[in-house]
A protein has these predicted regions:
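Fe-S-dependent hydro-lyases/dehydratases of central metabolism
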Residues: 44-247
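Extreme N-terminal basic, low-complexity initiation segments
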Residues: 1-10
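N-terminal non-cleavable signal-anchor helices
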Residues: 3, 21, 48-49
């Protein structure tokens, strides 16, 4: 059962024009949702599942990648986007800030052994700004991330994550700061993203988070992949084509 909660304001950053990063406030109705598991993304490449999993909760260890305005080129440099499929993009996530020209490691949270295997990414404001490349969330997913917690997101990046089944939730600056401190103090701490109760939990702490109603509804009902939805309606599409004389 879906329960309607209070109206909230969510800060997203639209990226309609290259180089423009102006804040926007989207007023949305919040919904409370029910529990399920995390699937692999289909994204129109390879086999598309006919029934997508409902995603309402993600848990695991987390890593904090500091800095506002982390753009998609930093997440996945453009030279790695020549691939025919998205397979293998994970190893190039944050490549230019993780690696020197000779391939040796730079100081970076993702290079620290204590954060290996982290499945939840924590970030600051305007995460995923810049170009709208869908390779960025693909690289994050294939690196192993299953959810992102940030102060705010670029609008197109947020949508691209949703269509991959990656929940993006927004927390206050202070709550992100406290969460990051807890993660850095104890990298083994489990972080839970609970879309049912709109909370993020870690240790004995629980903080409120928000998202957009459309993204949350898509995730919790298992309708976050448009191609899979289209394939589920194949019989209806075929019937309409016959009706119109196209088949």
């Amino acid at each position: 059962m879906l329960k309607t909660g209070k109206s909230d304001s969510i800060r997203l950053y639209p990226t309609k024009k290259a180089g423009v990063r102006r804040p926007s406030t989207l007023h949305t109705r919040m919904h409370r949702i029910s529990l399920a598991s995390c699937p692999a993304p289909s994204c129109g490449y390879g086999v598309v599942p006919m029934a997508l999993a409902k995603i309402t909760q993600v848990s695991g260890r987390a890593v904090f990648i500091p800095g506002a305005d982390i753009d998609t080129d930093r997440i996945i440099p453009a030279r790695f986007m020549k691939c025919v499929t998205f397979d293998g993009l994970g190893e190039f996530a944050f490549y230019d800030v993780r690696k020197n020209e000779d391939g040796t490691d730079k100081p970076h949270p993702l290079n620290e052994e204590r954060f290996k295997g982290a499945s939840i990414l924590v970030a600051n404001s305007n995460f995923g700004c810049g170009s709208s490349r869908e390779h960025a969330p693909q690289a994050l997913y294939r690196y192993g991330f299953r959810a992102v917690i940030a102060e705010s997101f670029a609008e197109i990046f947020f949508g691209n994550c949703t269509t991959l089944g990656i929940p993006c939730v927004i927390a206050t600056t202070e709550d992100v700061k406290d969460l990051a401190a807890a993660i850095n103090a104890d990298p083994t701490i489990e972080v839970g993203v609970d879309l049912v109760n709109e909370r993020v939990t870690y240790g004995d702490k629980s903080i409120p988070v928000t998202s957009t109603a459309s993204a949350r509804d898509a995730l919790i009902t298992g309708h976050w992949d448009a191609i899979a939805e289209l394939l589920e309606g194949k019989e209806a599409v075929d019937a309409k084509m016959k009706e119109l004389g196209w088949a």
